[in-house]
């Protein structure tokens, strides 16, 4: 895709020196790659292929991917707007055809904006789950395998091995995950603070989902999850059933 974009850029510049080809093919491939990576992890959860003690780095990686998705859509919107501006400058007038094309591009831009908000909502959901799991980890409610029979690095690298062949997005490393978790846990003294942060993230996700209407994903189910998790985390932050397992 990058080679096609580069070749098209050279062809367009040869004909119109003041115009450049925008990296639309590379952006499209990146968008589809991210969608497949996200689906790969979500299907693994749906099929219950992961243990509870693995969920934290799964949501950590998903948050990273959803952030990339939102950035990719922002880039696509910028490319579309730049393309429309270039066409308008070239035509110098707006007839019925150009107005019709403009309406079509505006529709795509609105769809991109809605999906970008959706991905921000999913990022907040992942952040909420991460903070909740960190809280449960801090108070000892998540069981890990015995150290002599377990290697967290090996599990991490095994789970995300299919992503290691990609250049973009840059694969996340176990050392990055470990540094992130250590930094978080060293600054938090009580799990209730993490539960409050988790509740805040779920509330932000709920607010975003409530403002969406033209997104194909099942918003009703996501809203139900965010509302339920928000209430549960608020109760946990208040010490409700703190002694339960």
Q: Predicted regions span which residues?
A:
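Extended alpha-helical scaffold/coiled-coil
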Residues: 1-245
